[in-house]
């Protein structure tokens, strides 16, 4: 194992997950840009924006909650309704993206299997829907390694140019999955 791989493993907590995943190779100026990506699908962009807006408004909801509990309760109900709409959008998107894939996910990157090899240092646009929150993310990534494994290719990619909101949403998803894994492990012991 290289020093870079060891450093990657120490820097972020990794989880095993099953997500909807699609990717597109980026070339030319798109590959080198650090701008946030936008999907051609308006539904995917809407889903992604819903979660970013939810994340960015959490501190406002906490402030309102300190001053007016009734208003905060109402806003939480409205937020749940919006979440349900987001889940309906995600179900539609899941049909378009394809069957869920088993991945290893961290704040720093992703590892997944693919039928075709990808060149090391290739730049990708990764379209992911993380469940059960139906969190849609479109992220830039660079292929770190591609290794053949039982007729498939294990692709390891590092996320690039994440916004703070994207990084926080990924971290929250990973923490929730980690907590879920711990609960399941405790239940299996009892």
Where are these regions (language model features)?
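Structured alpha-helical
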Residues: 1-190
